[in-house]
Amino acid sequence: MKIAVLLPFLALAGVVSAQTDALTPLNVRQVKVRGEIGRRIDITIHNNLMVLDADKDFLRPFEVRDQKGGYIGLGKLILAAVRFAAYSNEPNVTALKDRLVTRLIATQEPDGYIGICARGSRMNTLWDVHEMGYLIAGLLSDYEFFGKRESMAAARKAADYMIGHWSEIPAGWGEQTGVATHVAVTGIERTMLALSRVSGDAKYREFVVKQRALAEWSLPIVIGRRPGIEGHIYAYTARSLAQLELYRTDPQPGLLTQPDGIIDFLTRRGGMAITGATGQWEIWTDDQDGRGQLGETCATAYQIRLYDSLLRLRGDARFGDLLERTIFNTLFAAQSPDGRRIRYYSPFEGPREYHPGDTYCCPCNYRRIVAELPELIYYRSGSGVAVNLYTASDAKFDVNGVPLSIRQETAFPSSGDVTVQISPEHPTRFPVRLRIPAWASGTRVSVNGAAASEASSGSFFEIDRQWRSGDTIRLTMPMQVRLVQGRKRQSGRAALMRGPLVFCLNPAQEKSLANIDGADLGRFTIDPSSLEAVQDDSVRPGGIACRVGVWRPGYPTSDKPDLVLRFGEFADPGGLATYFRLRDLRVAVNDELIH
């Protein structure tokens, strides 16, 4: 047996050949997810997707087609429904998907237009092109996952309409609407590249390369909300993702400038909050402001897609760490614990609000990204397999032509103990690579009870051996509660973390705190010697909380804290505060994801 540590690959532009990704995701049909990630998938299907009023809220506007602009998000809903149907294999989910697609195609006009706008308002009003682009993507996904030729035909017809009418977008559209063109048509380049790849028709790629000049797009990250909202995180990240897709077939180093710039901004320049969220009011910010409109859910979804794309391209465990932090904190905080309601923003200080409806960008992008989570757990890695996310799950696929089953058992993120059972159909040699999170210093790995080896954090740990059915890998990742120093606006305070989880204070547990604002709660002082992880099912079954002794605002001199409180997981919908004072800030550590 050969055991090695894979150091993170250099994240430099032009290092990786465009022809070969380091990692390849599995299909959603090959993975079944349990644990908290699986629970979120299930409640999003059954408590959200399946209880929507799809006829009234989503389909009716496309059948009437009398609007002068606006946005519904039906294409995003179809994208989610297609993946959920493929993943769950539940007849009622597939029936909903079929109904959405069939009814949508029935609204397509002879010239190919598909949307909600009346004649005279098509292509030239917000957000008609944006809506149409995702409708094309949804129809294309129905063809990819279910082989529906009518969906492919409708997708191509709509794409041809868009290309043929592109000149109808006014030259001064950005000035007229206050929204830059690349923001107003968010998602179209990635859709057209996918349509070209699946259909084999080069004209859709040519539209992206020539008409949209994707390779020439080079916009620095803009701080603040300026005319044209050029600093729109979702739009910027979506176009950067399209550049990564173009890079895979046309490896121009400049195509990596924007994607790498996002990572640099998030991890080196103050752009990312401790929860993984970024931006205020949908726009890039770097001051660590945690109130109000932090972390638009669309931006969160596209951060996750960017991390996944870079992880696949380079195989750097760092991107898996970013995925883990963002998913377990900001993403899951954007949904009510029962799954029914979704947030537009997920601040770490002050009250959080749910979006009032089921349509529009954030609710629909939330469903989409949750439907993609099964593809972020396991990857093909050369001749072997890589385990990226830890959650109870099962996967079945071939490795080197040999059928393989993987079963992962763990209570993660409540526990750092993980078992991964490897069962090839017959004895086969291949490498298994395990992502060791940057927070998991002192991780031990063993196979079949043999002496454990220590694995370096922040890297992939490789075990290359002949595997037999039932062979079991055991990981033990230490999960001490740690205090993490705040930055910029949060300087002089610290947040509590354990593993990938960030903790927050819900004041409802203590009457004397009921009317205190989140900012004032942050003036409480934590007793580092009191920190204790305890089970807490208030946010999720088998969840975790941290019992903490705190002193009220002032200059505490007594050894005994004034109160003992429970700090819950960041997904706690009543959480109002995340950063707190310390008597001695030297007990806090730096955030391991910030460089």
Which residues are covered by each model-predicted region?
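Solvent-exposed beta-strand/loop surfaces of large extracellular or lumenal domains
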Residues: 440-465, 483-489
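Extended ligand-binding groove/face enriched in aromatic
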Residues: 63-67, 85-213
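Well-ordered alpha-helical segments within folded domains of soluble proteins
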Residues: 69-86, 126-143, 180-197, 231-248, ...
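Beta-strand-rich binding/interaction modules
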Residues: 427-447
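Glycine- and aromatic-rich loop/turn segments at beta-sheet edges
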Residues: 49-68, 106-123, 151, 162-181, ...
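C-terminal beta-rich recognition modules with glycine/proline-rich loops and embedded aromatic residues
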Residues: 208, 259, 320-329, 334-421, ...
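Structural helix-adjacent loops and short alpha-helical linkers that scaffold large soluble proteins
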Residues: 21-30, 85-98, 142-156, 195-209, ...
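Low-complexity, Ser/Thr/Pro/Gly-enriched N-terminal "stalk/linker" regions
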Residues: 19-73, 91-115, 149, 156-157
